[in-house]
Regions:
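Acidic, low-complexity terminal tails and accessory targeting/binding regions
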Residues: 2, 83-95, 143, 159-228
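Generic beta-sheet signal
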Residues: 4, 135, 143-149
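Active-site-proximal alpha-helix that buttresses catalytic centers in soluble enzyme cores
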Residues: 7, 11-72, 76
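Active-site metal-binding loops of divalent metal-dependent hydrolases
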Residues: 10, 151, 198
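Amphipathic, non-transmembrane alpha-helical scaffold segments
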Residues: 25, 29, 33, 56, ...
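Glycine-rich phosphate-binding loop signature in dinucleotide/nucleotide-binding domains
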Residues: 44-47, 136-143
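Short beta-strand scaffold positions
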Residues: 53-54, 127, 148-149
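Phosphate-handling substructures
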Residues: 70-128, 184, 191-197, 219, ...
Length: 228
């Protein structure tokens, strides 16, 4: 039986500023670095035989929490990347809430219906991310593996391998930053022990998705806004 820990990356700039990160390669915030310290302590005495990560910067930095105490190479896999958001890459949530609230609602609450020019669909992400996870599990029989990925990508891969509808946000939430999913893999099947455990974070380190304010960040021309 293979034991798998799937970890979402620490808080990055896009999380702090409520921006669609997608494949944009932003930095990890100071709070995110503290989350990584807490994550490292959580896994200090957990046996880890192999480590895989998305090749984006925020996941590679988060994966260093594992290499801090475990002498395992970090194996990068682009299939573990976050969903590509097409024309929404680097857009602020506040702008999207103002300009296209219906489409943003679809992205968050009706993911099986979401489509956007140039962006991946949830189904496409589920296929590539679950393919990577199945390959990792099959290549590591009877070992303990850590996999560092992204919020939507984790949600998509879990939907695929656990058979949970992608729209079931109650049983399939987007993990918190450095939130941990614990799976077991045996004879081609996955079972979940827990999803989104962030007990290693305390106080201000435990930033939950959706608990942040989304601001607009657009230039307003006073000549075009005479509503005062």
């Amino acid at each position: 039986m293979t034991e798998i820990y799937i970890i979402r990356h620490a808080q990055a700039e896009g999380n702090l500023y409520r921006m669609m990160q997608g494949n944009w390669d932003g930095d990890v915030t100071p709070l995110g670095l503290r989350q990584i310290d807490a994550l490292a302590e959580r896994f200090r005495h957990v046996k880890i035989d192999a480590l895989y990560s998305s090749d984006l910067y925020r996941t590679r930095v988060t994966a260093s929490a594992i290499t801090r105490w475990h002498s395992v190479p970090m194996q990068l896999d682009a299939r573990l990347r976050e969903i590509h958001m097409g024309s929404w890459e680097t857009e602020f949530f506040g702008n999207l809430e103002y300009r296209c609230p219906e489409k943003l609602h679809e992205f968050i609450f009706e993911p099986d219906r979401f489509s956007l020019d140039g962006a991946e669909t949830y189904a496409q992400v589920a296929r590539r991310a679950s393919e990577a996870l199945r390959e990792i599990a099959a290549n590591n029989p009877d070992r303990t593996v850590a996999v560092v990925s992204h919020g939507v990508a984790i949600r998509c891969m879990l939907s695929e391998v656990l058979g949970i509808p992608i729209g079931d946000t109650e049983h399939l939430p987007i993990p918190s930053n450095t939130g941990v999913v614990h799976l077991f893999y045996d004879k081609g099947s996955f079972t979940a022990d827990y999803i989104n455990d962030f007990s290693h974070l305390s106080g201000a380190l435990a930033v939950r998705p959706g608990n942040q304010i989304s601001l607009r960040h657009e230039y307003i021309d006073p000549a075009e806004h005479r509503d005062y």
